[in-house]
Regions:
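N-terminal presequence-like segments and the immediate start of the first folded domain
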Residues: 1-56, 60-73, 79-127
């Protein structure tokens, strides 16, 4: 079975030994993704804006892997503050209306207090 590792180029990946995404078999597994905007090197303080940026970041790596947003089959949402979850629902619906993946929401601390959420996905490769 072929395995392909996709890197964002972050030093953090090599420091702790992980990949931005891994393609294995017919699936791509995307690591937890935050709302950090890598073009501006900033992160919004608004959880809804961060959710939008999370999906932009996820979409970029899925395309690199040979997949797309509509192929997401599993999604995990991680929120430090559970009250930030519901305001993001319109963003989730916008991106996931076709995929309708299995979903779980966790409440847990994140690496940086500026991070209002993190999203991890599993998707099928394009047919």
């Amino acid at each position: 079975m072929n395995r392909k590792h996709i890197s964002s180029g972050s030093d953090f990946e090599s420091k702790i030994g992980y990949s931005r995404a891994v393609v294995d078999g017919e699936y791509v597994f995307v690591s937890g993704t935050t709302g950090y905007n890598y073009e501006t090197m900033t992160i919004s303080n608004d959880p809804v804006e961060q959710a939008e940026q999370c999906f932009k970041n996820i979409e970029k790596v899925l395309i690199q892997a040979g997949s797309c947003i509509d192929n997401i089959v599993r999604i995990h949402y991680i929120y430090p503050n559970k009250l930030d979850f519901e305001p993001c629902w319109p963003v989730f619906k916008k991106y996931l209306i076709n995929a309708k993946p299995a979903a779980t929401m966790f409440v847990a601390g994140l690496l940086d207090e500026a991070m209002k959420l993190e999203i991890e996905v599993t998707a099928r490769l394009n047919a």
